Amino acid sequence: MSDAVVAVGEPLRDLAARLGLAWQAEGDATAALRLAMTPEGLALSGEARHYGAPIRVDFTAGKAAHRRRFGGGRGQLVAKACGLARGVTPSIVDATAGLGRDAFVLATLGAEVLLIERVAAIYALLEDGLGRASANAETAEIAARMRVAQGDAARELASLVARHDIAPQVVHLDPMFPHRDKSALVKKEMRVFRDLAGDDDDAPRLLEAALDVASHRVVVKRPRRAPPIEGPAPHHMLEGKTSRYDLYVHRSLKPE
């Protein structure tokens, strides 16, 4: 739904052309959601009462920095689900990258991660955030383990993986679901994703594609009480306080 957002200002003219986004000059933008360059980096914003604060991808500060320093290492739920353990650091594709939070955690723990995002505006935020992380001394090594690609994983996962020359042992999925978090901030952020991407009605197709591509396992993040994605039953489940991971295992990940 690239027409739902407009890239604003001369600095984004080339980016808009490359990603197929609408573009308008500064001062002319009338779209509900605007992509614009700010001193803090690329930002996606709309009417604050509806969408909340501007959305950026920043791996160098804030929650990402805190989680990098104090997040709990390989004991974190996403790390356990993806099979990171002593002597085991799999190659991972995050096929529903979003703002890259889970992928950054996995890269922080040493994994090589390909992030795939289908929404052009969100991909642009990821590209910008990763570029700034690459230029920061504290995060450059982590950023070097992350690559970002734009595409619809439900339809072209195999070709995207081949194009980026990665043989993923693990595919991580976090399909859109009705968000029950009581935080108004989270609710407003999710409005942006829903307005741009809609619900993931093709989650069963996405799971099927992931199972075809992953050599060892597929992990699917779900609300704790939500049913699994329609299709094959998961082999294992890991539960957290508000979410869980459904694990579809082809074979075990073993220490190198």
Swiss-Prot record:
It catalyses: guanosine(1516) in 16S rRNA + S-adenosyl-L-methionine = N(2)-methylguanosine(1516) in 16S rRNA + S-adenosyl-L-homocysteine + H(+). The keyword Cytoplasm applies. It is an enzyme of class 2 (transferase). GO terms for cellular component: cytoplasm. The keyword Ribonucleoprotein does not apply. S-adenosyl-L-methionine binds at residues 101-102, 117-118, 174. It comes from the Bacteria. GO terms for molecular function: rRNA (guanine-N2-)-methyltransferase activity. Keywords: Cytoplasm, Methyltransferase, rRNA processing, S-adenosyl-L-methionine, Transferase. Its main location: cytoplasm. Belongs to the methyltransferase superfamily. RsmJ family. Specifically methylates the guanosine in position 1516 of 16S rRNA. This is Ribosomal RNA small subunit methyltransferase J. It comes from Chromohalobacter salexigens (strain ATCC BAA-138 / DSM 3043 / CIP 106854 / NCIMB 13768 / 1H11).
